[in-house]
């Protein structure tokens, strides 16, 4: 069954909702954004997450030192890296890694050392999907996440199109820029039970 990552959580209530609804991954954004949390805030929120739900830290062009500090302080299970990725960034990390790839039309999939790939829209967090026809995942070495403009109305179609390891959502479960607990529940319900949306 396709796994679900709910990203950009910053409150106890949102974390508890995502966990109780059946999220497999909880994402904390450490890169500058409206969803950014500090290591200290994430460490407190991480206490609410059971061990079978994986904690993911989201970074943009980080150093290895930054990753190691966050892994240690927050107890991250995975790091997700956007932007520049040094050749040795993922070597011998004490947790698993996800490299984000912006799908921008050239169809290029990097030769990555990461454990997972995540395919996202050209502007991450924008709520806009990428053109699914521009991505060919045939023969990929790694399991992959699909992100970029997913919501309760299109996520089942995305799963049918790509058969991904997991789907990732942030703005698609928000209302007016805040996490919407009902949208979180409905999104996870759609993924887990294959209930198509209205569009």
From Swiss-Prot:
Organism classification: Bacteria, Bacillati, Bacillota, Bacilli, Lactobacillales
Catalytic reaction equation(s): N-(5-phospho-beta-D-ribosyl)anthranilate = 1-(2-carboxyphenylamino)-1-deoxy-D-ribulose 5-phosphate
Tagged with keyword Amino-acid biosynthesis: yes
Top-rank taxon, per record: Bacteria
EC code(s) of this entry: 5.3.1.24
GO molecular function, one term: phosphoribosylanthranilate isomerase activity
UniProt-listed Pfam families: PRAI (PF00697)
GO biological process, one term: L-tryptophan biosynthetic process
Gene name in the database record: trpF
Name this protein carries in UniProt: N-(5'-phosphoribosyl)anthranilate isomerase
InterPro entries named in the record: Aldolase_TIM (IPR013785), PRAI_dom (IPR001240), RibuloseP-bd_barrel (IPR011060), TrpF_fam (IPR044643)
Keywords from the UniProt entry: Amino-acid biosynthesis, Aromatic amino acid biosynthesis, Isomerase, Tryptophan biosynthesis
PANTHER family per UniProt: N-(5'-PHOSPHORIBOSYL)ANTHRANILATE ISOMERASE (PTHR42894:SF1)
Protein family membership: Belongs to the TrpF family.
Enzyme class: isomerase
Pathway assigned in UniProt: Amino-acid biosynthesis; L-tryptophan biosynthesis; L-tryptophan from chorismate: step 3/5
């Amino acid at each position: 069954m396709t796994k679900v990552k709910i990203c950009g959580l910053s409150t106890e209530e949102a974390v508890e909702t995502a966990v109780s609804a059946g999220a497999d991954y909880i994402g904390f954004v450490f890169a500058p954004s409206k969803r950014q949390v500090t290591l200290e805030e994430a460490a407190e929120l991480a206490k609410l997450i059971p061990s079978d739900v994986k904690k993911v830290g989201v970074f943009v062009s980080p150093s290895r030192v930054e990753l190691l500090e966050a892994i240690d302080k927050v107890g991250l299970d995975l790091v997700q890296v956007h932007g520049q990725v040094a050749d040795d960034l993922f070597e011998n990390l004490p947790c698993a890694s996800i490299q984000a790839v912006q799908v921008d039309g050239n169809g290029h999939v990097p030769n990555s050392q990461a454990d997972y790939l995540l395919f996202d829209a050209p502007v991450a967090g924008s709520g806009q999907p990428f053109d699914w026809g521009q991505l060919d995942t045939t023969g990929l070495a790694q399991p992959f996440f699909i992100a970029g403009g997913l919501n309760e109305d299109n996520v089942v179609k995305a799963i049918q199109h790509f058969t991904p390891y997991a789907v990732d959502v942030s703005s698609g479960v928000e209302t007016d820029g805040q996490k919407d607990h009902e949208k979180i529940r409905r999104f996870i319900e759609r993924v887990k039970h294959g209930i198509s949306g209205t569009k």
